Structure formats: structure tokens, C-alpha cells
A protein has these predicted regions:
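Thiamine diphosphate
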Residues: 1-161, 166-167, 178, ...
Length: 246
């Protein structure tokens, strides 16, 4: 079934809000698009509409986290990263355990245009100290990531990257900081080709791997990276040793 990762956020954060009464949600007037508005329906006393004021939203989230609240704030990825200096000072350097949710990432939103596309968000967030980056590929994986963020005592800011487009819902395990092999064949001495993938493009990557398989059966491996920072160095090094091509 085709589902968007942002739908997982909208459906599951309110459920986790039932379990943890310190979870609060901040919206910058895009709640219907980011799906954070669904939190308001179940927990109106823990939902705060900040308006079109992302810088204020980030500052408020830092203050709330100081008092023990687990804050989820949401906007388009392109709009959040436009407040780079506020993220840098109010969250990154101060290691505030806030979850920033950036939706509508990548080019898949199409006709909305480049001003709405989160194209540079990963490079921007990776450049900042102490920020961890999560980029789930499927609806089910996004559910697992949201559960991890809610259940774990975070010690730094996290950036959760979500897509608008529906993608194939592939079942796979999730472990923070680890890459996962999602397609492999019977290799004698490792695969000929290993393809790295992250985020909503995974289904397309697997389709491409199957096309290669038609020419060289069972010689292509796909590894999914739901965590971009910290990256799983071990599986990258292992793949470089085992594969002819990356």
C-alpha cells in the first residue's frame, strides 16, 4: 500500500501523546500540510499555534524543552532551514532535545515549486553541531522512528525529514544509527553492486536494483540509511570492501 511518511507523523504522534503527557506540538500555520494538526484534535492543551513565525517557534521550543517537555515542531523543511541562525544558537549549541520535523522534502512535491522544496536541508543540518538527522523511507519505518523519538531520553536536537508523496510501505527493522540491508542475493564473495539509499526514494532504488538484476541476477544489494547523522560508517566500510561498485 502507498502511504506518505508525513501521514505516519500525523497518525502516530497523537497516539504517543496518549502515552507521554510531556509531549507538546508546535505549529507554524502549516498543520494540515505537515499533519501535526492532528495532535490538536486529541491534545488541544498541548498544541500551540505559533503562526507564520518559524524563528519564534524554534525559540519557544528551546524554552519548553528546558522545563522537561518533549517538543515536536513542524514546518516545511525549506522554511525551517531558513531559520538557520536560530537553530544554531537556540538548539544546536545549547543541545536542546527538540524534534524538528521538516516535511515536503526533496523534489517530489513538483508543481509547488522550488521555493517549497527542502533541497538543502540535510547539508544545512549536518553542518550544525549536536544535531542528529533521521530520514525514514516508508510509512512503517516512520512510525518506528517516531516511537524511538518519543520513548528515548534525547540529549540533543533531532531533525526528522518527511515526504509528502505516497511511497510503497516496505516493512524493515529500525535501529538508530544503523543502515539496513533491504535487498540482497546469494553472493559467493559479496555483491557486485551495493546501492545506498535514504528516505522516500527507496522504492525507486529497489526498482532500479531489480532492473540491474535482470542483467546480472542476484548481484545487487540495497542498503537503507534511516539515520543520516550519525551515519553507519561500519556498513559503508564493509560494503566498500565487499562490493565491486558502490
Amino acid at each position: 500500500k502507498m502511504k506518505a511518511t508525513r501521514e505516519a507523523f500525523g497518525n502516530h504522534l497523537p497516539v504517543m501523546g496518549d502515552k507521554y503527557d510531556n509531549i507538546v506540538a508546535l505549529d507554524a500555520d502549516l498543520g494540515k500540510a505537515t499533519k501535526i494538526a492532528s495532535f490538536k484534535e486529541k491534545h488541544p492543551d498541548r498544541f500551540f499555534q505559533i503562526g507564520i513565525a518559524e524563528a519564534n517557534m524554534i525559540g519557544i521550543s528551546s524554552g519548553l524543552s528546558e522545563y522537561g517537555y518533549k517538543v515536536f515542531l513542524a514546518s516545511f523543511g525549506s522554511f525551517l532551514t531558513g531559520r538557520y541562525d536560530i537553530i544554531r544558537c537556540s538548539l544546536a549549541y545549547s543541545k536542546r532535545p527538540v524534534v524538528m520535523v521538516g516535511t515536503h522534502v526533496g523534489m517530489a512535491i513538483g508543481k509547488d515549486g522550488v521555493t517549497q522544496m527542502g533541497l538543502e536541508d540535510v547539508s544545512i543540518m549536518r553542518a550544525l553541531p549536536n544535531i542528529k538527522i533521521l530520514n525514514p523511507a516508508t510509512y512503517t519505518e516512520a512510525i518506528k522512528v517516531i516511537e524511538y523519538l518519543c520513548e528515548t531520553e534525547l540529549d540533543s536536537p533531532h531533525y526528522l525529514r518527511l515526504g509528502r508523496q505516497p511511497v510503497e510501505d516496505i516493512e524493515m527493522p529500525f535501529e538508530f544509527g544503523k543502515g539496513q540491508i533491504v535487498k540482497w542475493g546469494a553472493y559467493d564473495e559479496g555483491p557486485d553492486i551495493t546501492i545506498f539509499s535514504t528516505g522516500c526514494i527507496l522504492g525507486d532504488v529497489i526498482d532500479a536494483a531489480h532492473l540491474i538484476d535482470e542483467r546480472t541476477p542476484n548481484r545487487v544489494r540495497v542498503i537503507n540509511f534511516p539515520t543520516l547523522k550519525p551515519i553507519d560508517r561500519e556498513i559503508i566500510i564493509e560494503s566498500a570492501k565487499e562490493s565491486k561498485y558502490l
